Regions:
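Basic/polar N-terminal segments that are highly enriched at the extreme N-terminus
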Residues: 1-2, 193
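Membrane-topology and secretion signals of cell-surface/extracellular proteins
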Residues: 3-4, 8-9, 13-24, 47-50, ...
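Acidic, metal-coordinating catalytic segment for phosphate/diphosphate chemistry
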Residues: 18-56
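Conserved aromatic-histidine-acidic binding/catalytic patches
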Residues: 45, 83, 134
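N-terminal strand-loop-strand
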Residues: 45-80
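Aromatic- and glycine-enriched beta-alpha-beta binding-site module
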Residues: 66-100
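Unchanged
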Residues: 86-182
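Charged phosphate-binding loop/patch that engages nucleotide di/tri-phosphates or the phosphate backbone
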Residues: 177-193
Length: 193
């Protein structure tokens, strides 16, 4: 089945509406993404500016006490695994694929809460610096985030082409990076803080 950009925009708009209702997101929080959807921008394409959809995985251990962070090569920061959305993936599958690629881990799984709700745990739009060597101006990533569970005793083998390293960290480290995501995870009972 061919990818339909208009259907993808409708899907993201409906997700935004349901997410905003579930998590009491203030009006205007995702104004740029909503404007891009209304304008018919190809938000699925990493070449669409001023912003496009990315997905990320909030990788948690089984107890919900630790998170796996990667040291992002291009940004030089510790972040949750994630990357550009690639059609025709489902959004959650995109986040899972990115986590597996960047960490080299197998046996990761989308948290069961997502199957019941059909929602991400967070949607965050954040500024990305220009990368002239890639022909990319400063722009925005509209990051759709999913909780992902790791099996016990799975070896982490980060992809050196993508990341400098990967480490299990305490949840306060994730909270510094993605405070609203951790607040939502806590509200849903998915973490033990």
């Amino acid at each position: 089945m061919a990818f339909d950009p208009a259907a993808f925009r409708r899907q993201v708009r409906m997700l935004l509406d349901r997410y905003a209702e579930e998590f009491h997101v203030p009006e205007g929080e995702h104004a740029l993404l909503r404007r891009q959807i209304a304008a018919g921008d190809d938000i699925h394409s990493r070449r669409t500016f001023p912003g496009h959809v990315t997905t990320s995985a909030l990788v948690l251990d089984r107890e919900g006490r630790r998170t796996l962070l990667i040291h992002h090569r291009a940004l030089g920061r510790w972040l949750q695994p994630g990357g550009h959305y690639e059609p025709p993936d489902e959004l959650a599958a995109s986040a899972l694929r990115e986590a597996e690629e960047e960490t080299g881990m197998s046996g990761l799984a989308i948290d069961p809460w997502h199957r019941g709700s059909g929602l991400p745990v967070d949607i965050d739009s954040h500024r990305i610096p220009a990368r002239p060597e890639r022909g990319e101006p400063e722009h925005w990533h509209h990051d759709i985030r999913f909780a992902v569970r790791a099996r016990e005793h799975v070896e982490v083998r980060p992809d050196p082409a993508e990341v400098h390293g990967a480490e299990w960290r305490g949840l306060p480290d994730l909270e510094r990076i993605a405070p609203r995501a951790v607040r939502n995870l806590r509200r849903l009972g998915l973490v033990d803080l």
